[in-house]
Amino acid sequence: MTAALFTFADGARQASGLASECGVPVNQIDVHRFPDGESLVRVDGSAETALLFRSLDDPNAKLVEVLLAASALRDGGAKRVILIAPYLAYMRQDVPFHDGEAVSQRVIGKLLAAWFDGLVTVDPHLHRIASLDAIMGGIPALAVSAAPALVQAIASDLDSRTIMVGPDSESRPWVESIARPLGLDVLVGEKIRKGDREVVLTVPDFARA
């Protein structure tokens, strides 16, 4: 079964590196945006297994184009379409915090499951959910940890006084997964969010043993 990686222009550099590591060709997805904001998506090439690469920051703009690309890939003969989204959007809200709110995590999981046969992402924001599979509507979902790559990147340039700092309790598992292999101390702060862009961060004093 032939496989290829397909990428939008905004992720071309990262996608090219990934395609090289996987030993598959990389193809471009072209987007034309009309004056009213609609997007025309055109996929270059085809494959039986299509790996669609796009990080979903700026999700309201990118999600529709990703779904259109998935449809075009299937129309072009793809039997399997796998989404590779290094950043997976709308994962923060896993419960309604106030009456009338949508649970975005569940909605986006079902939406992606309707169009893709599998998903790969990096360190998704899963606070109260045990695994990514639980919200992905039955398709295989792989959450890759960035910790090994980060450990490798910083291991050769560490000061003996280095401390790994996390902003809040939710960050502790990520911080510890990097600090532990390097033998580093960990410091976790407390975060109080006062608005979308206003955050108060308190970091406790630290004394080495």
Residue ranges of each PLM-predicted region?
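PRPP-associated nucleotide enzymes
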Residues: 1-209
